[in-house]
Regions:
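Juxtamembrane transition segments at transmembrane-helix termini in multipass membrane proteins
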Residues: 1, 182-198, 222-322
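Helix-coil boundary and N-terminal low-complexity module in membrane systems
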Residues: 1-140, 204-206, 283-322
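Nonpolar helix-loop interface/hinge motif
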Residues: 6-58, 62, 178-258
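Membrane-helix interface segments in multi-pass membrane proteins
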Residues: 50-89, 144-176, 234-277
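Hydrophobic alpha-helical membrane-embedded segments
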Residues: 90-98, 176-185
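Hydrophobic, well-ordered secondary-structure segments
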Residues: 127-128, 167, 171-174, 187, ...
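Generic low-polarity alpha-helical segments
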Residues: 130, 156-162, 210, 219-220
């Protein structure tokens, strides 16, 4: 392995060498602070576009809820309405992860892009990003069914006894391990789709190769730590707002419209969470992708050449996948 000590060529937010955890977090923070418009501003704009219609629809549907507890329809409209903002959050996250991967990719070379340039650079990749999300959902359902199917069927036929309960507990633990494994092996799908211009299926295969071997544990650890950090920050910000909203509804005598306000609060919480946390978590994934390509493919050499001589970023893989 090459000795990188003392090599600190830094045209942008990172030194062009293998990155430490501190390098990654510092670079993402620098990218967000140095380009608020294309990070948090774009996150706000995208979230508003996606969340406003779904939150409004959710509030309207939830407002149709009956408060007759003995009604067969009790809870139906409220549940549907309260869930609709989640769809808006999902759509926003699909677009945002792509936008932010592009912004971070340009920032690596010291290039500051605006909202318009980011849109131009990523809009053709949105169908592939959506396809990747669909494949992820299908895969999650398949894995869940494969692991929990037999234990649940046994519990349904034999009832809950010592054996079936133990089997269910073991199955749930196995499911958690499987999710963490797949979550790590598919960590770079979004970055690969946006930066390398690959399709959804090819991006999954590429991410699988880049996360193989010993780097798996490092990637898992960094992503897990990042998830804890952003979740904590989101809860610290969102929870007081949610509690204030609930108590405000009760104080104003709006219990009859609790489901409608729940949908609205869900949309507001999703908006705040997206603006505050998504730029950081998406930026970490993008930089981990760059880091793995530096370690495995010598991408730093190509990035140095591009930084010194100009030209488009060398994101499409210049070496044979391995």
């Amino acid at each position: 392995a090459p000795a990188y000590a003392g090599l600190e060529f830094r045209p942008g937010i990172i030194p062009l060498r293998p990155l430490s955890l501190g390098d990654v977090y510092s670079a993402v923070t620098k990218a967000v602070r140095g380009n608020v418009a294309a990070t948090m501003g774009l996150a706000l704009l995208t979230s508003l576009v996606c969340l406003i219609p779904f939150t409004a629809l959710g509030a309207w549907v939830a407002n149709q809820e009956t408060l007759e507890f003995d009604s067969e329809e009790f809870g139906l409209y409220g549940t549907i309405g309260s869930s609709l903002p989640t769809i808006g959050s999902l759509l926003a996250s699909i677009a945002l992860t792509g936008f932010l991967a592009y912004v971070i990719g340009q920032a690596v070379l010291g290039r500051k892009v605006g909202i318009g340039e980011t849109w131009d650079g990523t809009k053709r990749r949105l169908p592939a990003l959506a396809g990747a999300v669909v494949l992820t959902i299908v895969g999650a359902v398949a894995v869940t069914g494969a692991i929990l199917g037999v234990p649940i069927a046994l519990a349904a036929s034999q009832g809950f006894n010592g054996f079936t309960v133990m089997l269910l507990v073991l199955a749930f633990l196995l499911l958690v391990v499987a999710y963490l494994f797949l979550w790590t092996r598919t960590a770079f799908v979004t970055s690969v789709i946006v930066l390398e211009g690959r399709g959804a299926f090819n991006a999954f295969a590429r991410s699988w190769r880049l996360t193989s071997g010993r780097p798996f544990w490092r990637i898992l650890g960094i992503r897990f730590l990042t998830s804890i950090l952003v979740s904590t920050v989101a809860q610290v910000i969102v929870l007081p707002i949610a509690l204030f909203g609930v108590f405000g509804i009760i104080a104003l005598g709006g219990e009859s419209q609790i489901f409608m306000w729940q949908a609205i609060l869900g949309g507001v919480s999703g908006l705040i969470s997206a603006v505050i946390t998504t730029p950081f978590s998406a930026g970490v994934d993008a930089l981990l992708t760059v880091d793995q390509r530096i370690r495995r493919e010598g991408l730093d050499v190509q990035l140095i050449h591009t930084a010194q001589h100009g030209g488009p970023p060398p994101w499409p893989s210049a070496v044979q996948d391995r």
